[in-house]
A protein has these predicted regions:
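Short beta-strand edge/turn micro-motifs at domain boundaries
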Residues: 2, 108, 132-165
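Short beta-strand segments enriched in hydrophobic/aromatic residues
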Residues: 42, 54, 113-115, 152-155
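A solvent-exposed, acidic/Ser-Thr-rich amphipathic alpha-helical stretch
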Residues: 47-116
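Short, P/G- and charge-enriched loop/turn segments at secondary-structure junctions
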Residues: 82-85, 123-127
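Short, cysteine-centered beta-strand-loop-beta hairpins and adjacent loop/turn segments enriched
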Residues: 115-125, 158-161
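Flexible, surface-exposed loop regions and adjacent strand-edge segments
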Residues: 167-169
């Protein structure tokens, strides 16, 4: 069997198409990793990852969970206080959809989250509650990588109840 010769312009076109496709897949993978990094940052209180997750001018809206809206740093500071009484957190992010904008320099993303939290001793007096919903984001490609520029947390399900008299620490 002999190979069919491919004309040079066609080779160039195929190469450019392949390179573009690989670049898009690399961006998609990087955005997936960004969502996982956010979950790790929150669950393990690794706030040093903040600049690897959020753009410097990022905003967040966590009002649907009883939280606040503001700069990402303000909202993450609030979240740190809100989660302080809950030492065990397991964040799951899944079903991520990515719609690129502007020559793949930004994208709109939506993903589901499930966030069980626990306090007390496992098998004894442990209290577990869980919230679920959507993260609706605008992410932006920066020289150092993809970052969340805008995040809206839309809580849609709450399983369990907060303890009576529970208040988020100041």
């Amino acid at each position: 069997m002999t190979a069919v010769p491919v004309k040079e312009p066609m080779k160039e076109s195929l190469t450019e198409s392949l390179v573009e496709s690989l670049a898009e897949h690399a961006d998609r993978l990087a955005i997936h990793e960004l969502m996982y990094r956010y979950a790790r940052m929150v669950d393990f209180r690794e706030w040093k990852l903040f600049d690897q997750v959020f753009a410097a001018d990022a905003t967040c809206d966590y009002v649907s969970s009883g939280g606040i809206a503001g700069t990402a740093r303000e909202v993450m500071d609030w979240l740190d206080r809100a989660l302080a009484p809950w030492p065990t957190n397991l964040h799951f992010v899944t079903n991520l959809s990515i719609d690129f904008e502007a020559a793949r320099k930004s994208a709109r993303t939506t993903c589901y989250f499930l966030g069980p939290m626990a306090r007390g001793e496992m098998g004894k007096d442990q209290l577990v509650i869980s919230s679920s919903g959507l993260y609706v984001d605008r992410v932006r490609k920066q020289p150092e990588g993809w970052r969340i520029a805008e995040r809206e947390m839309r809580m849609t399900i709450m399983q369990g109840s907060l303890p009576e008299g529970y208040a988020i620490p100041d």
